[in-house]
From Swiss-Prot:
GO cellular component: cytosolic large ribosomal subunit
UniProt function note: This is one of the proteins that bind and probably mediate the attachment of the 5S RNA into the large ribosomal subunit, where it forms part of the central protuberance.
Protein name: Large ribosomal subunit protein uL18
GO biological process, one term: translation
Homology family: Belongs to the universal ribosomal protein uL18 family.
Protein's UniProt keywords contain Cytoplasm: no
C-alpha cells in the first residue's frame, strides 16, 4: 500500500510529464503547498535555474495576511510572483500544480497570478 506522500509524488510526476509536452520552452510556475504555508517558483527547466519565487514565509506576506495557510495568503503570494516575474522578464509560463488539486489555495494563487499579468 502506498503512503499519501508516495501518491502525491506519483501525481506530481504525471502532471509534470504532461507539462513537458506542451511547455515549448516556457518556464514552469511550480506550486508547493503544506498545511501552514504555500510557495511558488518560476523555474527555467532548460537552464535549470529559478527565475523568481514567492512564499507565505516572507515578511511582506506575513504582515498583510491574518494566516499563512489560507486562500487570502495564497492570493497575496500569487500577486507577488506576478510582480517578480515581470521584473525577471517573464510573461508566459506553464502552470505546474504538482500533485495538488486545482482548488482552494492553489486556484486562488493561480487566479491572482493571472490578474497580475502572467499568462498560462
Amino acid at each position: 500500500m502506498k503512503t499519501s506522500r508516495e501518491k502525491l509524488q506519483r501525481r506530481a510526476q504525471r502532471v509534470r510529464t504532461k507539462l513537458r509536452r506542451v511547455a515549448e520552452g516556457r518556464p514552469r510556475l511550480s506550486v508547493s503547498r503544506s498545511h501552514k504555508n504555500i510557495s511558488v517558483q518560476i523555474i527555467d527547466d532548460e537552464k535549470g535555474i529559478t527565475l523568481a519565487s514567492a512564499s507565505t514565509l516572507e515578511k511582506e506576506v506575513i504582515a498583510s495576511a491574518k494566516s499563512s495557510g489560507n486562500v487570502e495568503a495564497a492570493a497575496l503570494v500569487g500577486k507577488a510572483i506576478a510582480e517578480r516575474a515581470k521584473k525577471a522578464g517573464v510573461e508566459d509560463v506553464v502552470f505546474d500544480r504538482g500533485g495538488y488539486m486545482f482548488h482552494g489555495r492553489v486556484k486562488a494563487l493561480a487566479d491572482a497570478a493571472r490578474e497580475g499579468g502572467l499568462k498560462f
